[in-house]
Amino acid sequence: MMRCGEGYPGLILAKEDFIMKPVDMAAADINAEYLGVPRLSLMENAGRAVAEEIGNAVDSGRVAIFCGPGGNGGDGFVAARHLLNMGFEVEVHLLGHPERIGSEEALVNWGVLGAMQPHPGGFSVDFVRDSSEIKPTDADVVVDAILGTGVRGSIREPSRSAIEIINRSEAFRVSVDIPSGLNPETGAVEDIAVSADLTVTFHRMKDGLKLADPAVTGEIVVRDIGIPPAAEIFMGPGDLLRIPSRRPGSHKGENGRVLIIGGSRQYSGAPAIAAKAALRAGADIVMVAAPGSAARAIRSLSPDLIVRELEGGYIGMESLDEILELAEKADSVLMGCGAGRETSTARTFMRAIEDLHEMEKPIVLDADALRLMDYSDVSEYRELTVTPHMAEFSSFFKLKSMIFNDFRESVSAFQSISSRIRGTVLLKGRIDMIFQGDRLRLNKTGCPGMTVGGTGDALAGLTAGLRALGLSSFDSASLAAFINGMAGELAMERHGNGFTASDMVDMIPSVMDPGFYGF
């Protein structure tokens, strides 16, 4: 297999150049396991990297490692074992009862340390029940493997007392991945944080480390732990972490409102499928604006949709004010599904897009909308997502026939073409390609049964639904491709080749559940 990332223009793979947010790192970690790289291996590599950096800084002596109950603590357990192999004396202090260890990989490595006890000398392991049991240490090196990147806000005991003891120590202070207590996104210290002499972070530089006071981070070293580039290029279940959680106490409509403008005298199924997919994506309210007979058919298909009946058999200028009134209430707008290719519809869509752009409304264009206009009409709209298949892509970007020698060449060409617009392009195919400027994601989910009609409408609805939840145009399109393909695979598994787009839409909640993938 070719190395993912090679030859892709604008895709930055150098670790010192690309800065990750915590969610990017968490997603890459899960996606690596999805590709077949066990997280236990990643933890082993991380812990060994910490031990090696300590060995580079200090020749010998005693190392005290304070470990939390999560993955950061697991890295500390592994580091302890490697430091012992390097000739250091090591003491490990778990902050809490072993039953609180929440990471399966950390629990495995805690078990390894336990199996090494009692040790003939120079190695001890204990756990503290409360902060009163944490004592000052006179070790030569103190390691902070307490909190990692998942903690924000005030620091609770016994972590607080451990941080205070580390900061009072005259030892060489090392933080694992990020100093405990540092906000991993902003670099701010919101309560209390370890002041490290050295921070060993993994895979890539993190937002918070780049922004933080050097007095808190000390020297920062980025170490490779074996996450393949494919874990960041190919979509995977880790990317589901990008979907925002619903706020407790939120009210109807606060978790996304979608407007779908489509349908015509001939087509009512396309906007209905798109609308149901948007609901399944998690949007609270989905409104459909469709011409007469299509609107009545859609209303009869689902009581969960709000349907506005427009005049005539096709969308025309007489409905523009009504469409814009509905759009005012929407968080995203999808246009084109089943709309037909009437001249009046093209005029209405172009005028609506101009007004929606002024309103800064996220827009998704699919199907007939991509035949009624071309890229030059919308090239400056950053809040735009287009979801073409290859024929629609060629029409929208005014292309003639293209021949490529290999997959890499096709990706490079499609990315260059897609950069003609500021928005996001989701090019549907056997391998979906998602582009925005120099950004690229690929998606391999899906199955042959998805040639059935309506699967593209479901994808467009998913994209609009996720966009309404607050995801960026790039992330919503990328996630929609992954979810849509997985829903197709699950529908095929349950119904065989005869599954319909509606069967596929019903699978969406299942494949959006991280538990479906065992994570």
From Swiss-Prot:
Classification via Pfam families: Carb_kinase (PF01256), YjeF_N (PF03853)
Binding site residues for (6S)-NADPHX 2: G338, D457
Positions in coiled-coil regions: none
Region called NAD(P)H-hydrate epimerase, residue ranges: 1-233
Chain residue ranges for the region called NADPHX 1: 71-75, 148-154
Gene Ontology MF: a single term: NAD(P)HX epimerase activity
Chain positions covered by the region annotation ADP-dependent (S)-NAD(P)H-hydrate dehydratase: 235-519
Stored PANTHER family: ATP-DEPENDENT (S)-NAD(P)H-HYDRATE DEHYDRATASE (PTHR12592:SF0), ATP-DEPENDENT (S)-NAD(P)H-HYDRATE DEHYDRATASE FAMILY MEMBER (PTHR12592)
Protein name per its UniProtKB record: Bifunctional NAD(P)H-hydrate repair enzyme Nnr
Source organism of this protein record: Methanothermobacter thermautotrophicus (strain ATCC 29096 / DSM 1053 / JCM 10044 / NBRC 100330 / Delta H)
